[in-house]
Amino acid sequence: MDLHLKDKIIIVTGGARGIGEGIVKVLGKEGAVPVIIGRNEKDNLATVAAVEAAGGRCGQVVAELTDPTASEKAVKAVIEKYGRIDGVVNNAGANDGVGLENGNYEAFIASLHKNMVHYYLIVHHSLQELKKSKGAIVNITSKTAETGQGGTSAYAAANGGRNALTREWAVELLKYGIRVNAVVVAECFTPLYERWIETLPNPQEKLKSIEATIPLGHRMTTAEELGNTTAFLLSDCSSHTTGQLIHVDGG
């Protein structure tokens, strides 16, 4: 299927590693021009090189999105270089384990900035360009908002906010023809996930026990699979889909 993404300029926050990297590589294969916004230039450039080696195009902007001023600067840099924005994938963040019992005000607020505030700011500053292009927005979110996990209050709250923003923006932006959807992630073996699993007793046994609970194939979702769904939601092939929380999790 041709997703009609050729030459589309798509911002992908946190696009250098993990799920974001998977999304960027799929978009590159589809002929889009993903633009990574991420804090580590070395990681950004490595993913840019991988996309280009596969015959695609890719760009990058270095930004620390926990800084509220960084989102506007990053979006301006994209517009200055490419002249437009056709889509946004909000993906950057991390399950940072700020719980109810072990957390505090400062850590909780810092986690919300790391995991939710820049979702709002990136889209806020991209909106004029998205109006022109009638672009699409995809928010990457986590099952923790719906299931809980324990010991990660801030991350769960941020993902609840991501889900709420998805539906709120879908309503607010209807008049501009801008669609907004979310891809809800459960288990995907990213570098961050690997670091987390290694903190547990008997990590390999724990990993196998987690995989055993996943109904479809008893395996984790791949970053490429998440990228495929994200690309579809950005495409006009999903032209009548908005305000949806799409669970890509093997059941």
Name what the model sees in each region.
Residues 123, 158, 166:
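Active-site helix of classical SDR
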